[in-house]
Amino acid sequence: MGNDFVVPREEDPRREAVESRGYTVVGESWGARLELANAPDLSIFRGTLSRVEHAGIKIFELPVTASSDLYELERANTADFPFTPATSHDLLDAEATRDLWNKGFRVSGTRDGELLVGATVIARREKHAETEFTSVLASQRSSGIGTAVKAASIIACANDGARVFGTGGAAANEARLGVNRALGYNITERWYSYKAPLA
């Protein structure tokens, strides 16, 4: 990022000094957490899955043999991910996409026929799970798929012992923020990306 940008948290007292030097906000981003009880109530997530299943949408865990489909989904969507200096989404190549499974990530998704139209990628480390990304084909958005694949990933990781879930994104991606709030995530931190004034 160099010296062209600074990315303080919302409560950082340095923001006032940065603004006084002529830096301007060029992006906002957020982090959110979901905390489950030791004996978690997963009914909200199961209810989310039930609603889309009634609409004919089936969510399932994807095996590594679906890596090329995930790569094609990401390639179709890469231009739609908002960019900020603090929040970027880089398109993985086909080999790196396949390697997600080798690194222990789990992928929940759904298909329209043979076409993968939505997926979320999550990693669990003991009791903590972090969403890497969620991707839904443009033609399938506003159908509940994004919420459903994320709900499925939460159930899978919770059943394996995860109790704290993390995620984040750019403030410009209101749909992603809405998905996470619907599933019970709470915003825990915000960052502002400031760009230095022209010399």
Language model features: what each stretch is:
Residues 1-61, 194-196:
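Acyl-donor-binding surface of acyltransferase catalytic domains
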Residues 46-89:
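Short amphipathic alpha-helix that is part of the acyltransferase structural core
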Residues 23, 30-39, 56-62, 66-72, ...:
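Ligand-binding pocket scaffold of soluble enzyme catalytic domains
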Residues 1-17, 131, 139-152:
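Acyl-donor binding region in acyl/amide transferases
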Residues 9-28, 147, 171-189:
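Conserved active-site alpha-helix within GNAT-family acetyltransferase domains
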Residues 1-8, 157-169:
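Conserved GNAT acetyl-CoA-binding A-motif
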Residues 78-138:
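A conserved beta-strand-loop-helix scaffold within acyl/acetyltransferase catalytic domains
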Residues 137-148, 160, 172-175:
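Conserved glycine-rich acetyl-CoA-binding loop
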